[in-house]
Amino acid sequence: KIKMIGLDLDGTVFNDNKEISEENKAAIREAAAQGIIVLPATGRPLRGLPKAMLEIEGIHYAVTSNGGAVYDLDSRKAIYEDCIPNEEAKQLVSVLNAVDGLVEVYIDGVCYAQQSRLEHALTYPLSKPFLEYIWKSRERQEDLEAFLTADGGNVQKMHLLFGSTKERQRAFEMIAPYEADLAV
């Protein structure tokens, strides 16, 4: 008997326009009605989970931040976390400030980004639905490194976006000394 179904969201359950079909919703509802745990699994933070998914009756848990956290959706509390310690995250942000890219940190189910870099990321050659999602779902900070110092929370995930493969490669070279402790 099937006990659990894990579902990737973007590009799988949701199409490239970030929409879910009625057919997919019905299949998810049917599985949940049969007592099967339906578990969305995504790179998104808790706050970035699509409303259309959360409104489907019978979904009680979600794997978020690429496995950085598992949430009980009824209580909105993390029941598991595998975080990057705050000090390490601050070091990485400091190092990555030298590249032309968007650095994001996910803390307690929310994604934070530096305002100036978020604005610049809108010029990257990415799909319009993706850019809209990023713009709408990020909490903007004047200075991400200072925010990490003030917040003190551990980081469920770090996400990087670049406008060019050259900058991406530069960033990977800069964080190479940290890779033993990270999933890159």
Region annotations inferred by a language model:
Residues 2-18, 92:
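Asp-based phosphoryl-transfer active-site loop
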Residues 10, 67, 163:
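Flexible loop residues that form catalytic
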Residues 1-2, 33:
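Short, Lys/Arg-enriched, disordered terminal segments
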